[in-house]
């Protein structure tokens, strides 16, 4: 008798870019896995909106149940599902320096740092991955060089960032990204993460797991770019999820070229 499938939920901001990219990721890497079932659900709001809903209930309400209240699309997809049905919860959101959806009493506080500390375990409240400045940053990656085309951008440029990709990129159509492109994205993002924390030696998998987690990356973003130049180091964290999820064997495949 076959074992029960492990249910995994991907939660993300919108139904456009994020949905297409993560649906492709699920198809490329998880569709052939008999023991894992992926459910994609948009929050139809940014990470601060989600955090605000959870904060009101002192984080006693599961993020899956809050999602049903926030998004009609998610509510429909989660029909008949309970929060306890999901073994793992992953959240993929954009960096949003404006904090437009934070109550006044929390303005000026490091809310994103608090959220990364709260959402740091996929088997509990969920594990949060932040892309800087947004998921569209994957279009910065050049497959041939396996690197990002730009290092940073000004915080003032974030609002127009997604409209800056007029020319064709290697990741122009999310639904057509193949495994080789994803491997290149993983290589580019692990190199960029290492650069962000100013690590000059060869980045091993052990170093990556223990030193390039989402909380550490944000601390370096905040200290070296955001608060020291009004900048963001461009980094897409979706490929970092793949490196963490599929562990060292996958890391070796990515870094073999």
Regions of interest found by a model, annotated:
Residues 2-5, 20-40, 48-60, 69-257:
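C-terminal accessory helical subdomains adjacent to catalytic cores in phosphodiester-
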Residues 66:
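Ligand-binding clamshell of periplasmic/extracellular solute-binding protein-like
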Residues 14-19:
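Short acidic, Gly/Ser-rich segments with clustered Asp/Glu that frequently serve as metal-coordination loops
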Residues 44:
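A charged nuclease-like catalytic/ligand-binding cleft shared by nucleic-acid processing domains
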Residues 9-11:
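Conserved beta-strand elements of the Class I
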């Amino acid at each position: 008798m076959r074992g029960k499938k492990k249910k995994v939920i991907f939660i993300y901001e919108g139904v456009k870019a994020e949905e297409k990219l993560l649906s492709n990721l699920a198809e490329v890497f998880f569709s052939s896995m008999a023991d894992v079932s992926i459910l994609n659900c948009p929050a139809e709001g940014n990470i601060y909106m989600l955090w605000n809903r959870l904060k009101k209930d002192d984080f006693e309400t599961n993020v899956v149940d809050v999602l049903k209240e926030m998004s009609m699309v998610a509510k429909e997809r989660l029909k008949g599902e309970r929060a306890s049905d999901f073994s793992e919860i992953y959240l993929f959101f954009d960096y949003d320096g404006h904090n437009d959806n934070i109550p006044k009493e929390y303005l000026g506080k490091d809310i994103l740092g608090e959220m990364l500390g709260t959402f740091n375990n996929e088997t509990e409240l969920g594990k949060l991955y932040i892309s800087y400045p947004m998921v569209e940053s994957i279009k910065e990656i050049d497959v041939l060089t396996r690197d990002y085309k730009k290092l940073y951008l000004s915080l003032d440029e974030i609002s127009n960032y997604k409209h800056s990709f007029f020319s064709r990129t290697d990741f122009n159509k999310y639904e057509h990204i193949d495994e080789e492109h994803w491997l290149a994205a993983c290589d580019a993002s692990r190199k960029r993460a290492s650069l962000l924390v100013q690590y000059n030696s060869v980045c091993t998998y052990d170093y990556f797991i223990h030193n390039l987690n989402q909380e550490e990356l944000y601390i370096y973003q905040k200290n070296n770019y955001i608060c020291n130049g009004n900048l963001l180091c461009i980094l897409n964290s979706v490929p970092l999820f793949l490196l963490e999820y599929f562990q060292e064997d996958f890391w070796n495949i990515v870094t073999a070229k």
